[in-house]
Amino acid sequence: TSSTRVLTDEIIDESIFGNTTSFLTFKMFEADGILGINFQYLQKSKDFLTPICIDKNTKIVLELANGKQVKLVNSTDLTTCNELQYDAINKNNLRVLNGFFYFSPENFTDLKTEKVYLIKITANTGDVNFVIKPYLNSEIYKTKSKPDTYFIENLKCLGL
């Protein structure tokens, strides 16, 4: 029998600067013993937004407080880009990038005890970096969270 457990979306990073708003959310999952995250990176701006494309070589790198790195690999060989959309009502350009990334079995142990201070998406169109805050008071979601302990808290929920 197969088993899948999926946690709810949590906001990891939010940026509101000038005409541009962006945010990153993670949804952790475990499917038949494989641990991964579904991420979504949304950008909204009155200005032009540069496209981001991910492919089979794209990785997500988590920089931990102890100096170690945890790397996640893309779950697909397909190239995916955040296509430009236009919100005519609010006159905003929108780009949404989604992806599924897996941990290798041996490399997520440190996430049980170490805070994450930087998340880097190594895309084929260039790296995207997120400096992770200890506390996030989201203006978009109207929530408060502790993104740097996301993995410490949520790995427990999956019984890992």
Regions found by a protein language model. Name each.
Residues 1-3, 66-78:
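Short, surface-exposed loop motifs enriched in S/T, G, D/E and P with embedded aromatic residues
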